[in-house]
Regions:
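Detector for small/aliphatic-rich hydrophobic stretches
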Residues: 5-6, 17-161, 399
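Sec-dependent bacterial lipoprotein signal peptides
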Residues: 1-15
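Non-catalytic, conformational "gating/processing" segments within enzyme and secreted inhibitor domains
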Residues: 62, 102-269, 287, 291-369
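Short alpha-helical patches at coil-to-helix transitions and adjacent helical residues
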Residues: 3, 69-73, 192-196, 390
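Non-catalytic interaction/Regulatory regions outside core domains
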Residues: 4, 87, 331-334, 340-358, ...
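Short Gly/aromatic-enriched secondary-structure transition segments
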Residues: 91-95, 212-219, 276-284
Length: 402
């Protein structure tokens, strides 16, 4: 499958429905509840706004897209700590967070990183890791190093980038460990001129609260945006699920484990363009799902991708850090961003979803009488994974071909 992948926040949605005919996970643990104050919840909502804009910016007609908006948001948040006023304003405006101070953004990211580390659902594994590497002998300002340690739990390491293969091996080793071996080679173009690599890694592995029965997985046709028909494996189930139906699309909510996380699948009605519904979904925030008995047919799929983000971020308004060598003087003098890159992985099957991403910034210098609906996901669709208590988007994307 030919793909485009991006990553920064995680998209999963939850419903509390359960089917007694399906075996449940034993001892699911206490449901994660990230308690945000009013301001932090507002920042979270702005982060989801950024996620939607990012998907629209990358939604090429005939290519699959995978995003982790949270991963990119955290990486840019780290970079913002070293930006001068003009560069900082570009970063936070692009993130839809211009109304908040650096201290408020750092506090919000610290809260998320700490809460995610405390997740105790045995059916869900979730991790956010940060790290930084600077050229040996390069002087990094103390305030920046302190903020990275305090708010982002990010060690600042020294690395000999002139020994390119050894430098790549160290950073790839970190990525492999942080993503449970789902991303092993970042393919970063390091050389002796590299001064900085700032990195975030996110990893999610969630088991459906009701797994799909493999006996019901059947071969079917997925109708791609490119006009081609793809033969693929479809998972099939009929069960009570949270569901939204409009004149333009159908949306279903699938939960993981103890419902701390959920996934949404949004399917445009036949004849409706996938890009058109992205804006409609954004306008429909706060929509109320109802419980239906859903006859669901959902394709198994996997995405592996690498995306260079420079032009996308520049088109969204971040320019100074790429062109002004005084823009990051809060980190060090003379530093420029040469590359923003995301590597990603996503796999969905009968048991659940495994997803991971790395964002790197390289620098030089329920109802018993539920109505029945059918949702056959055999044409392009949008998906997302959310943390339930905040609604924060971890991963999101679109599938237009198999």
């Amino acid at each position: 499958m030919k793909n485009l992948f991006l990553l920064l926040c995680l998209l999963l949605l939850a419903s509390s429905c359960s089917n007694n005919d399906t075996p449940s996970i034993d001892n699911p643990g206490e449901k994660l509840n990230i308690e945000l104050d009013f301001q932090q919840r507002s920042i979270c909502e702005k982060g989801n706004d950024f996620a939607g804009k990012l998907l629209l910016q990358t939604a090429e007609e005939n290519e699959n897209v995978l995003l982790s908006p949270l991963s990119l948001q955290v990486a840019l948040g780290m970079l913002a700590n070293g930006a001068n006023e003009e560069a900082y304003n570009e970063i936070v405006t692009t993130l839809s967070m211009a109304d908040y101070s650096l201290a408020e953004l750092n506090g919000y990211h610290q809260k998320l990183i700490t809460a995610i580390a405390d997740e105790n659902d045995p059916s869900v594994e979730l991790a956010l890791d940060n790290s930084m590497w600077f050229k040996e002998g390069f002087s990094v300002k103390n305030t920046f190093k302190e903020n990275m340690s305090t708010y982002y739990n990010a060690p600042v390491n020294s690395l000999d980038f002139s020994n390119t293969e050894k430098a790549k091996a160290e950073i790839n080793g970190w990525a492999k460990e942080a993503t449970q071996s789902t991303i092993k080679d970042l393919q970063l173009p390091l050389d002796a001129s590299t001064t900085m690599v700032l990195a975030n890694a996110s990893y999610f592995n969630g088991k459906w609260d009701e797994p799909f029965d493999k006996k019901n997985t059947k071969e079917g046709i997925f109708y791609g945006n490119d006009g081609k028909n793809y033969t693929t494996q479809f998972m099939n189930a009929k069960r009570p699920l949270a569901y939204v139906g409009t004149d333009s699309y159908q949306k279903v909510y699938l939960t993981f484990g103890n419902s701390s996380f959920y996934m949404t699948i949004t399917l445009p009605k036949e004849g409706v363009n996938l890009r058109d519904i992205l804006s409609e979904i954004e306008r429909a925030k706060g929509e109320q799902a109802q419980i239906f008995s859903v006859k669901l047919s959902l394709p198994k799929f996997q995405i592996n991708s690498l995306s260079k983000m420079n032009k996308i971020l520049q088109d969204m308004g971040i320019n100074k850090v790429f062109e002004d060598d005084e823009s990051l003087n809060g980190i060090a003098n003379g530093l420029l961003v040469s590359l923003v890159q995301q590597n990603s992985y996503f796999n969905m099957d009968e048991n659940g979803v495994e997803a991971s991403s790395t964002s790197t910034i390289t620098g030089i210098t329920g109802s018993n009488a539920a109505p029945i609906v059918e949702m056959k996901v055999n044409r392009p669709f949008v998906f997302a994974i959310h943390e339930n208590s905040t609604g924060a988007i971890l991963f999101m994307g679109k599938v237009v071909r198999m």
